[in-house]
């Protein structure tokens, strides 16, 4: 090797592979108000130190790669790199840690959940040095929140639009979810709405199939809404699912819904994607439509305790991307949801300021700086006997959605809707009178059933129905 070549090698950058923790593990770092903070549940491979695992997460989800590159010298890594600033062992687990990572705000495009997730939950989840990785929570700084529109309208504006106050809203998913013709589908909608429900809903997998094209469904559902409104004197709605194969087709369906004059449309935000969801949310804000969000596919992402992403993160992302309702579990029905954890992310959806509370899975204090709230939807295996618990757990600002619990009534859809409305009104009145629904709920329902034959029939049908499985969504 010539002396000239040796000189260049000695003054050049130090090529090769070095431990991530030398650059990305910084326990002395003081987080900034503008940082996005993440709490990851990290399970390192055997022999990988926790500091190296946490640093690898910070590196691979920000500026790092597997080897040193000369272009590191063309930027300021100290300004742009993610930092693992704290590690704590998970109680009861041998080799599992909560790694806290801080990301500088400049790493993310303004107003883009898509870009935020591409970095934070991107390729790092396939990293070989980690046996498993789960994103438990995010702290979104106020400076980043202010770059998002958020929900098209929010809870208070929705109540004003519907002129409904002081109680939860009632909904129903039309069943069978697939196979009905548009006219029969519209008939089912009408029967439910005239019986006393506020909303009916397209199932998440109803889009535009051969047995029922979307335009036909929209027209017959609009007819059902107007007829039910005329008969009851109440504002009614049906969640018309605008989810489609392209953003252009999705917006076309939303435009047609607006032209029909209906109050609300629907989107499957995970299968449709965050870019499509934000696009639709902006359209709904500009055109006065409420937006109902279904979370189909969420359990693929959030149900495994050690890998993936907790639903509280998906809930925060939805509030940023935009939606007025989102399904959030029931605690008491057939779908997943442990009480304190569910109420933790329900608060993250509805409230403006949420304190850190590890007992409910909330790792960071979150300030939404007046971004409108999202109404949680309780849906899945619920019926009239659950009404006291649901009213007690969720309070007024929620949608209680009974699909089979309405349509399965032995006398038909309208009596099923009557039963649910009577049960709800009885529970709200009892609560307002100071009665303890958790203790006296069954008695409240029995008393109401004495003067409502529809409720009495529903109570008889579902008196033995329970879904007693242990939740896997635990701390």
Curated annotation (Swiss-Prot):
Belongs to the RuBisCO large chain family. Type I subfamily. The modification N6-carboxylysine is found at residue 201. Gene3D superfamilies: Ribulose bisphosphate carboxylase, large subunit, C-terminal domain, RuBisCO large subunit, N-terminal domain. The modification N-acetylproline is found at residue 3. The basic functional RuBisCO is composed of a large chain homodimer in a 'head-to-tail' conformation. In form I RuBisCO this homodimer is arranged in a barrel-like tetramer with the small subunits forming a tetrameric 'cap' on each end of the 'barrel'. It catalyses: 2 (2R)-3-phosphoglycerate + 2 H(+) = D-ribulose 1,5-bisphosphate + CO2 + H2O; D-ribulose 1,5-bisphosphate + O2 = 2-phosphoglycolate + (2R)-3-phosphoglycerate + 2 H(+). It comes from Welwitschia mirabilis. Substrate binds at residues 123, 173, 177, 295, 327, 379. Binds 1 Mg(2+) ion per subunit. GO terms for cellular component: chloroplast. Pfam families: RuBisCO_large, RuBisCO_large_N. Its EC number is 4.1.1.39. One of its GO terms (biological process) is reductive pentose-phosphate cycle. Mg(2+) binds at residues 201, 203-204. Heterohexadecamer of 8 large chains and 8 small chains; disulfide-linked. The disulfide link is formed within the large subunit homodimers. The active site is at 175 (proton acceptor), 294 (proton acceptor). Residues 1-2 form a propeptide. Its cofactor is Mg(2+). GO terms for molecular function: magnesium ion binding; monooxygenase activity; ribulose-bisphosphate carboxylase activity. Keywords: Acetylation, Calvin cycle, Carbon dioxide fixation, Chloroplast, Disulfide bond, Lyase, Magnesium, Metal-binding, Monooxygenase, Oxidoreductase, Photorespiration, Photosynthesis, Plastid. This is Ribulose bisphosphate carboxylase large chain. It is found in: Plastid, Chloroplast. The record marks 334 as: Transition state stabilizer.
